[in-house]
Amino acid sequence: MAKIKFFALGGQDERGKNCYVLEIDNDVFIFNVGSLTPTTAVLGVKKIIPDFSWIQENQARVKGIFIGNAITENLGSLEFLFHTVGFFPIYTSSIGASIIKSKINENKLNIARDKLEIHELKPLETIEISNHSITPFKVSSSLPSSFGFALNTDNGYIVFIDDFIVLNDKNIAFENQLNQIIPKLSDNTLLLITGVGLVGRNSGFTTPKHKSLEQLNRIITPAKGRIFVACYDSNAYSVMTLAQIARMQNRPFIIYSQSFVHLFNTIVRQKLFNNTHLNTISIEEINNSTNSIVVLTSPPDKLYAKLFKIGMNEDERIRYRKSDTFIFMTPKVAGYEEIEAQILDDIARNEVSYYNLGREILSIQASDEDMKFLVSSLKPKYIIPTGGLYRDFINFTMVLKQAGAEQNQILILFNGEVLTIENKKLDSKKNELKLNPKCVDSAGLQEIGASIMFERDQMSESGVVIIIIYFDQKKSEFLNEITYSFLGVSLDVPEKDKLKTKMEELIKKQINDIKDFTTIKKRIGKEISKELKVSIKRAVMNLFTKMTSKAPLILSTIISI
């Protein structure tokens, strides 16, 4: 009988950097290697990625990486895993493979293409990896041809699904194969691992509230000028709907995102969208068009940055006209409300009509009834919700309990908590891995301790004060000269001069308080140096708080000359 372990390196009690590890006996399967972009401004932090230390220590056992829904939250840290640990085979859909290759071609993933081993899986075709049978199946999600995975073990199936909805539309791009895979898995599913989606936030099924054709037609049909539509690059469903409207209304169609242009071309090549009579033009022709539909699409952080530039007339291609119409199609995401409000203010200032459909149209994720259908059909012994906050997991549990699930069936895990199932029985003891997620800034990978993030917040909000003190080794004494640098500290000149005077008095007092800074070797000992720098930092911080109500980051250093 199989011994199974499951744990998350990211994605639990957070939205993003999804990364899950499944151990079946001695074999390891990784699901997703995503990244997270901070929704609040943290100075210099571009993204946060999982801690891959465990994978590095066990890389010989890793059989592959499985990516069913190829969005940033699921593949955004691929290059960092490959550079810090090594290359592993990737198993994904043809669309997923296209997205990964496109990002590599644009150098968004700093990976040599010839080192990649990407396996494009075919739906419902079982593959064998190290004596394990794995069956991919299509699920209806925001990207075409998204996959769920069913792994067969001696104890029953383990089913992994990121996002899905129950959908019976005859749309080959967003085909749902749950009805075909369920008979194979029903009554023999040991573990269901599934994204929490909209469960607990939206009762009923997600469909038809995810559809946008009617709302978009209502806005676009009477509009005389250009139509700008902003949406995340994970929302291919809406982009394809806009292309359909452009074709029906004989409007030129523009996608302002080179990576999404590649994805759209792949979708067309795979005959997932009929582009006959669709007039697609490049973004360079935007100013020659009077009635085009322009899709502005990127990951959330880059999309908002792009919209800011356009709103401030700093974009090299787009200038708003009074005849334009703007449509927001981004879902409500905690942390982005203020940014979104600022962008809409910029649009209004340009006298452009705008509409916000983000509250009307649901993202393509499971709602209450979708999840109830999946659970009641598969009848899993255990269920693990993923990809959400703790409160989402609690709501998920309440919804499924109302549908008849038992409390002990639903297992809530935090990052690093290791769940063990042996002979179909859950081990009541949870081991825990110590994880240290990394942040990516302009200098590359950095540690992400609480103190580091706090200091970055300080720098972004109040600036930095650098204090340099000089120590003469020959005379074994401090010089009177002290150098100050104020970076990003908003103070007028008289206030700054007054602060410098007070700071100098404080620092000289701190120096005088240290009586044993000289040694036989006529140098400052490490402990004395550290004590002095900490003392100066505290004193200057208190001074700033009292005199300015600001709290900049204080950096003090001692230079021996």
Swiss-Prot record:
<keyword id="KW-0812">Transmembrane</keyword>
<dbReference type="InterPro" id="IPR055132">
    <property type="entry name" value="RNase_J_b_CASP"/>
</dbReference>
<feature type="transmembrane region" description="Helical">
    <location>
        <begin position="80"/>
        <end position="100"/>
    </location>
</feature>
<dbReference type="InterPro" id="IPR036866">
    <property type="entry name" value="RibonucZ/Hydroxyglut_hydro"/>
</dbReference>
<dbReference type="Pfam" id="PF17770">
    <property type="entry name" value="RNase_J_C"/>
</dbReference>
<protein>
    <recommendedName>
        <fullName>Uncharacterized protein MG423</fullName>
    </recommendedName>
</protein>
<dbReference type="GO" id="GO:0003723">
    <property type="term" value="F:RNA binding"/>
</dbReference>
<dbReference type="InterPro" id="IPR042173">
    <property type="entry name" value="RNase_J_2"/>
</dbReference>
<keyword id="KW-1003">Cell membrane</keyword>
<dbReference type="InterPro" id="IPR041636">
    <property type="entry name" value="RNase_J_C"/>
</dbReference>
<feature type="transmembrane region" description="Helical">
    <location>
        <begin position="29"/>
        <end position="49"/>
    </location>
</feature>
<dbReference type="GO" id="GO:0046872">
    <property type="term" value="F:metal ion binding"/>
</dbReference>
<dbReference type="Pfam" id="PF22505">
    <property type="entry name" value="RNase_J_b_CASP"/>
</dbReference>
<keyword id="KW-1133">Transmembrane helix</keyword>
<keyword id="KW-0472">Membrane</keyword>
<dbReference type="InterPro" id="IPR004613">
    <property type="entry name" value="RNase_J"/>
</dbReference>
<dbReference type="GO" id="GO:0005886">
    <property type="term" value="C:plasma membrane"/>
</dbReference>
